[in-house]
Amino acid sequence: RNAATVSDNLTNGGRKKLNISNFIGYVPADENENFSWSMEGYINDYGIAQMAKKLADQTNDATKKANYMSEYYYYLNRAKNYSLLFDDSGQDVTSKWLRGRKTDGSLNLGNSDNNTGFNPFWWGADYTETNAFNMAVSVPQDGIGLANLYGGRDQLADKLDTIFTTDGGYIGYGG
């Protein structure tokens, strides 16, 4: 479980805020680009889970198999923590987003140019070199789970249509 171990030196990689995210399921908003750190971590966790499953399938040693399967389930469950970042408070899919959260679980509202409200066009803040539009469907490890969050396959298709048909007007450091 080294991917769940807090590192003192992130110069050559690692994960930010593991001392907190291991317990609350995401990197909190007091860390710049927190949302992206969280989402990348979930994808990494899914990869680690798949590796553990493969190792379990290849060994005949019962103890090793049990340990690998324990790792598999641990990381597979962590990979699904993206659901903690889903904001379903909108009336329809056009106003539902994957967003950054604060340590207390409340949504981060300070990603706009005046830091007073959520703006899905805002490039940066919670997001690394992107915005809420680009990250709204960035869950390659669990497409069915993502569709369920939006309300089903048709609603996920509607969200994709919204992303593809909304005019860019991005703002922030990448806009």
Language-model-derived ranges and their functions:
Residues 1-80, 86-175:
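Active-site core of glycosidic bond-cleaving carbohydrate-active enzymes
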